[in-house]
Curated annotation (Swiss-Prot):
Glycans are attached at residues 113, 137. This is Tetraspanin-13. The gene is Tspan13. It comes from Rattus norvegicus (Rat). Residues 1-19, 66-72, 189-204 are cytoplasmic. The keyword Nucleotide-binding does not apply.
Length: 204
């Protein structure tokens, strides 16, 4: 049977949703591992990662059930949700790749000022204090501050990695964006194909 047939479309759609399921479980596992080993203390960051993982898992589950049962309603909603996710993810990925150093610095400073727990994690792990300037009167968990040594600011250190991280995130996001649009196309195609084992007089 050619790859455009019913069975091939079904198998491809199932494989794609199994991939999404593995990615979602990986996200949830990484978040739990990070907070369990004390690498991440920000409940907000962990909550967002886990929420994204659960959302992706639910989408994959809907797509998998719809593909296995050739369920028209589930496949329709799966296709619409996947299209919306593609639009958002593609836009965010392009934005990550398009940000220049000045814009990266502005975003990092906003995030720095709004997340106290993540800020403490960064200062402790990178052994730096303050974003651009360090005030000795401020509390800093870095080892340099505890030993009364001179502490460097965190902005230059974070800036070295920010561009690489954004390019990595943008590239991964673009990859999954194209898998999502592939999923939309496969779902649309699969919905309009007739199961060869079904009743010939039945509708799809």
């Amino acid at each position: 049977m050619v790859c455009g047939g019913f069975s091939c479309s079904k198998n491809c759609l199932c494989a794609l949703n199994l991939l999404y399921t593995l990615v979602s479980l990986l996200l949830i596992g990484i978040a739990a591992w990070g907070i369990g080993f004390g690498l991440i203390s920000s409940l907000r960051v962990v909550g967002v990662v886990i929420a994204v993982g659960i959302f992706l898992f639910l989408i994959a589950l809907v797509g998998l059930i719809g593909a296995v049962k050739h369920h028209q309603v589930l496949l329709f909603f799966y296709m619409i949700i996947l299209l919306l996710v593609f639009i958002v993810q593609f836009s965010v990925s392009c934005a990550c790749l398009a940000l220049n150093r000045e814009q990266q610095g502005q975003l990092l400073e906003v995030g720095w000022n709004n997340t106290a727990s993540a800020r403490n994690d960064i200062q402790r792990n990178l052994n730096c204090c303050g974003f651009r300037n360090y005030n000795p009167n401020d509390t800093c968990p870095a080892s340099c501050a505890k030993s009364n040594q001179k502490c460097s600011s965190c902005a230059p250190i974070i800036g070295e990695y920010a561009g690489e991280v954004l390019r990595f995130v943008g590239g991964i996001g673009l990859f999954f964006s194209f898998t999502e649009i592939l999923g939309v196309w496969l779902t649309y195609r699969y919905r309009n194909q007739k199961d060869p084992r079904a009743n010939p007089s039945a509708f799809l």
